[in-house]
């Protein structure tokens, strides 16, 4: 399996044109040529933040486009500035919901200071690195389908782990490999932050 694993090719396309009208995404991340993630980058020097990236996804990105379509195109979409990262797995134009993909700061929102660069550098310095990125794609992302009362169709979602979920599961896995099974753990997240999915 190691040889097959090493054959995986991760690539990043900057200013990726995704339609015949010349519209571009700041970043397109691919695995073996298949689109996995998109990203819009904003910088404070131009008076723009991740909120402008979210607005761009909602207002200027056609969710019917194959690359952006739910269950057909990229699995996750990131809105990024120097301080925060937000994400969604389902673009629905103005109805799109973005959630934070931040590390947390002093027990609250945002990201801690980074003496070596941007507060959001963990995204490309850690998360998008080959080992972790392939781990996320192979073991963490899943399709959720919940039945609703007829005639409503099933409620569907692609679940992409938030940063704290990813960190807690990877820490627990590493600890279990070191000390073995049989240990009890307490997972502490704030209300509505995905404890049940972390435990699962």
Per-region residue spans from a language model:
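ATP-dependent helicase/translocase motor core
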Residues: 1-200
